[in-house]
Structures are given as C-alpha cells and as structure tokens.
C-alpha cells in the first residue's frame, strides 16, 4: 500500500498522531515535522516529505525548514548497507542516523524558531478529504507524484552537478595559471575545514585529511567522501575515525539543494519560493547537525 493509499483510508493520520508524538514530547516540536524527521531514519530526503505531503501546504515556515534540514542531516536506511560494504562500521552509521533526527530538529529550530501556530493533527486538524474515488485512484495519483518528483530531481541534479564541475574547471584553470597544482573546490574547502576538524577533536596532524573529507562531502556527496575515507583510514586514530565517519553521515551537500528543489518543490509547488530561499540555510543547519553528532561521538568514545 503506497503512502497516498494510507492517507485515503486514514492510516497515515493515525501514524502521524502516534509516531510523531514521541519526538514531539521529547523536543516540543509539532507532530508533522517530528514524523518527517523520524521517517528520514528509514527513507531518503526525497521520500520522507511524502509522509507528510498533505500537510506541506499548511506548514509554518519553521516546520517547512525543519523538514528540509531533517532530509539533509540524515541518510536513507537503504544506503547503509552500501556504506557498510565499504568497511564503514555499521554501528556508527546507525548511531549517526538516529542522532540526526533530533539533531536536525535542534539546528532547524535554532536557525528558524517557530513563531506561528502549527497544524495539530492530534486534535483532528489537517487537510480536508483528499477527494479520491477509491484506493486505485489514490495509488495512481501517488504514482504520478513519484514520477513527477523523479523527473524534477534528475533535472535539478544535472544542473547543479554541471555548475559544480564548471566551478572546479575554473579553479583548475586559475591554479594552472598561478602555479597551484590540483586546485579544486573540495581542496579549498579542505583547507578551510582543517581548523573545524581540529575543533571537533581531530588532532592537528590528522585535521587536514579530515577537513578534506568533510569538504568532499559538502561539495560532492557522502558516498564519494566515504570512498576517499577508506583510502586514508589508516592515517586516523580510532577517535578521529569515529569523528570523521559521523561527520560524513548525512545528505548535507550542494546537490541536496537540487534534490529538495526538485523533489519537495514538485509535491509542494506553492512553497517552491521558500524552499529555494532556505536551501543554503538548510544545508548549513544540516551540516552543523552532522558536526554536532561527530563531536559528541568523539567525546563519548574518548571517554570510553
């Protein structure tokens, strides 16, 4: 049964009231943004908003921002096996994924506090009847949403990846002119992030490599960064390895802005302007969430 079918028969409204209530009680966030954050533990940033799709149009600005941050701060459960196959400890990936849900909400609320009254599903508030004739009609509409989202995401990714490649090409040309070899956007960010990696608890001698990996994750994606990590894993101490693995565990990269614009914008076109306006801020908040998880992991492992 697809998500649209579950909404049609009323199952999703019950799930929102119950599952979303757990994080709501702990953090004081709304049911819908809490459920979206929880869903990101199991599915990707493109699929999680579908869980609260009927509520997207009526979400407050803070709730919408929290949905965006939650998607970027986490990784999909379906990709964990792939990362584990690279040699990344599965227990670290699982811990980072579960920490991303409250961490993403925390950073989202710090950067975009709630100033409006959210919809209260626990009181029966929410969208009106969906208007579908039966389950088949609801399933067909859900399938069309999926195809529309996939096409929009593909188009946005092509544009963003092309833009990043253009910037790297320009930096490479500038480097050759001024005698700087292998100048790239991720390399520049690696130098920038070296002090940050040191602040997270990575020794200065290892901070350059750690900062470079964080830069690769931000500019490219976490998969590329994890592959690069496996090639230099021997350079890190156990605590540094944990910090790096936690810092890389999230979809917080430039391409994710394209995925949000294409995916979330396709199912909530009335909020597209806000989604595009919040893209970089959501990326910053999600990155801070990942770095906070990394710092906590390094602290507890060093104490153990």
Task: Identify the function of each model-found stretch.
Residues 92-107, 242-250:
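Alpha-helical transmembrane segments
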Residues 14-28, 36-40, 54, 137-148, ...:
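Short amphipathic alpha-helical coupling elements at transmembrane boundaries
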Residues 296-304:
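Juxtamembrane boundary at the C-terminal end of a transmembrane helix
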Residues 144-233:
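Transmembrane helical segments that form the transport core of multi-pass membrane transport proteins
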Residues 26-84, 210-296:
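Alpha-helical membrane segments and immediately flanking helix-loop junctions
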Residues 17-51, 118-138, 183-189, 213, ...:
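Juxtamembrane inter-helical linkers in multi-pass membrane proteins
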Residues 1-3:
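Short, small-residue-biased leader/transition segments that mark boundaries at the very start
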Residues 98-149:
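Long, contiguous bundles of hydrophobic transmembrane helices that form the permeation core
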């Amino acid at each position: 049964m697809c998500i649209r079918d579950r909404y049609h028969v009323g199952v999703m409204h019950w799930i929102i009231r119950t599952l979303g209530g757990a994080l709501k009680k702990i953090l004081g966030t709304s049911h819908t943004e809490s459920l979206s954050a929880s869903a990101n533990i199991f599915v990707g940033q493109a699929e999680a908003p579908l869980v609260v799709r009927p509520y997207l149009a009526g979400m407050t600005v803070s709730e919408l921002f929290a949905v965006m941050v939650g998607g970027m701060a986490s990784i999909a459960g379906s990709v964990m096996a792939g990362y584990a196959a690279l040699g990344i400890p599965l227990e670290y990936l699982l811990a980072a994924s579960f920490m991303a849900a409250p961490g993403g909400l925390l950073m989202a609320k710090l950067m975009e506090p709630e100033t409006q009254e959210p919809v209260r599903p626990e009181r029966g508030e929410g969208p009106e009847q969906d208007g579908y004739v039966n389950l088949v009609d609801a399933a067909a509409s859900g399938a069309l949403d999926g195809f529309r989202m996939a096409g929009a995401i593909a188009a946005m990714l092509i544009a963003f990846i092309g833009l990043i490649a253009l910037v790297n090409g320009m930096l490479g040309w500038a480097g050759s002119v001024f005698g700087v070899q292998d100048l790239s956007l991720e390399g520049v960010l690696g130098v920038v992030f070296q002090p940050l990696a040191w602040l997270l608890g990575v020794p200065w001698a290892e901070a350059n490599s750690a900062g470079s990996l964080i830069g690769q994750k931000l500019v490219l994606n976490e998969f590329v960064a994890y592959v690069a990590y496996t090639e230099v894993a021997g350079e890190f101490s156990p605590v540094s390895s944990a910090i790096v693995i936690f810092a890389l565990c999230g979809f917080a990269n430039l391409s994710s802005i394209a995925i949000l614009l294409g995916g979330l914008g396709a199912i909530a076109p009335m909020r597209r302007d806000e989604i595009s306006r919040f893209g970089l801020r959501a990326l910053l908040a999600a990155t801070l969430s990942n770095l906070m998880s990394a710092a906590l992991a390094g602290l507890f492992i060093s104490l153990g």
